[in-house]
């Protein structure tokens, strides 16, 4: 059995209880890693500054560290006791920085090396999910020599083409004809050596934040996303005031529960910890949910979804940030899985 909707209020109560009894001095000097070098740098800066402000508002000795402007070896000079990772995409969400922090013996928020490396690769992620019997759209890895007609015959139209290691919809194209495939591939290949095409599931776009680890992992409330013109691109994700977020979703309770169960199984299959967010499509014809991606370092901007779900469970932004950081107190050296 999975810990889903029925435990939401108790999760919120446990968070409040744990924070009430926390000695902030035990957190020591905290580094907030932000910025970085990926295509999601701008969003990382927004997330990181929000996290930094929240921690300081709680009285935590927190300091920004721009991983895109400073040499990682400077982390040693800063004498941080623990790290809050607010990096998104490659070199921040792919196991790279996690491996460095392991070597330095610094506890950090989010998934460890292996889970981070698995989740950043959309193709490997799908392989893990499929091996665990979890529903995800049909896919193919594209190359410059792919047979475009064969791809369409396999996946149907419309289909989605995107870089395998990018997030925030960077380089993503919804392909409606075989003639559009070469250009879509070229766009994605300009950002990544590995490109994936997958069947486009038509229906409701949902996301489900997750917290915890292993047997104690839990799914937070599901959020339904309604972007303008049904286009949830980079701009509409982070800057548009026209994108609607519904929490509660307005869907039947059993549908929400099915999405939470699927998302939690996906989170556990990858070995994620602390927090994450599963993106899901709900097929309008069959009502079946399909897994798209797992985010192991979700955004924490004003438009971000994990804070929204946490608030629905009774936890405000600053308390969520502090609780996530507090999970590093439980980490043991060498926990790379």
UniProtKB/Swiss-Prot annotation:
Catalysed reactions, as listed in the record: 2 D-alanine + ATP = D-alanyl-D-alanine + ADP + phosphate + H(+)
Protein location: Cytoplasm
Cofactor note: Binds 2 magnesium or manganese ions per subunit.
Cofactor: Mg(2+); Mn(2+)
Organism of provenance: Polynucleobacter necessarius subsp. necessarius (strain STIR1)
Chain residues that bind ATP: 152-207
Positions with a binding annotation for Mg(2+) 2: 293, 295
Function: Cell wall formation.
Pathway: Cell wall biogenesis; peptidoglycan biosynthesis
Family listed: Belongs to the D-alanine--D-alanine ligase family.
Keywords of this entry: ATP-binding, Cell shape, Cell wall biogenesis/degradation, Cytoplasm, Ligase, Magnesium, Manganese, Metal-binding, Nucleotide-binding, Peptidoglycan synthesis
Annotated InterPro entries: ATP-grasp, ATP_grasp_subdomain_1, D-Ala_lig_Van_CS, D_ala_D_ala, Dala_Dala_lig_C, Dala_Dala_lig_N, PreATP-grasp_dom_sf
Annotated ATP-grasp domain residues: 126-326
GO cellular component: cytosol
Gene3D superfamilies, sorted: 3.40.50.20, ATP-grasp fold, A domain, ATP-grasp fold, B domain
GO molecular function: ATP binding; D-alanine-D-alanine ligase activity; metal ion binding
Entry's Gene Ontology BP terms: cell wall organization; peptidoglycan biosynthetic process; regulation of cell shape
Protein encoded by which gene: ddl
Entry protein name: D-alanine--D-alanine ligase
EC number: 6.3.2.4
HAMAP family associated with the record: Dala_Dala_lig (MF_00047)
Main location: cytoplasm
Positions annotated to bind Mg(2+) 1: 279, 293
């Amino acid at each position: 059995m999975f810990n889903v909707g029925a435990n939401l209020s108790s999760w919120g109560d446990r968070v409040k209880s744990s924070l009430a009894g926390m000695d902030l001095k035990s957190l020591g000097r905290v580094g907030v890693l932000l910025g970085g070098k990926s295509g999601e740098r701008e969003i990382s800066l927004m997330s990181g500054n929000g996290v930094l402000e929240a921690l300081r508002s709680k009285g935590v000795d927190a300091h920004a560290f721009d991983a895109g402007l400073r040499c990682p070896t400077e982390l040693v000079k800063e004498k941080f006791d623990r790290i809050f990772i607010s990096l998104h995409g490659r070199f921040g969400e792919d196991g790279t920085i996690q491996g460095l922090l392991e070597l330095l013996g610094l506890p950090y928020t989010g998934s460890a090396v292996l889970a981070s490396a698995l989740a950043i690769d959309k193709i490997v992620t799908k392989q893990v999910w499929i091996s665990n019997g979890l529903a995800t759209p049909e896919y193919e890895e594209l190359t410059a020599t792919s047979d475009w007609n064969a791809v369409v015959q396999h996946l149907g139209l419309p289909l989605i083409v995107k870089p395998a290691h990018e997030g925030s919809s960077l380089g993503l194209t919804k392909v409606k004809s075989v003639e559009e495939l070469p250009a879509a591939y070229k766009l994605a290949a300009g950002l990544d050596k590995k490109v994936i095409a997958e069947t486009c599931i038509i229906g409701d776009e949902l996301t489900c934040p997750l917290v915890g680890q292993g047997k104690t992992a839990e799914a937070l409330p599901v959020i339904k996303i309604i972007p303008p013109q049904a286009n949830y691109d980079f701009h509409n994700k982070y800057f548009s005031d026209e994108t609607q977020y519904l929490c509660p979703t307005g869907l039947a309770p059993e549908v929400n529960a099915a999405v939470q169960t699927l998302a939690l199984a996906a989170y556990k299959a990858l070995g994620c910890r602390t927090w994450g967010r599963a993106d899901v499509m709900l097929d309008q014809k069959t009502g079946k949910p399909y897994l798209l991606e797992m985010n192991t370092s979700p955004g924490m901007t004003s438009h971000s979804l994990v804070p929204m779900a946490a608030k629905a469970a009774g936890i405000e932004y600053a308390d969520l940030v502090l609780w996530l950081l507090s999970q590093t107190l439980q980490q043991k050296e060498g926990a790379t899985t």
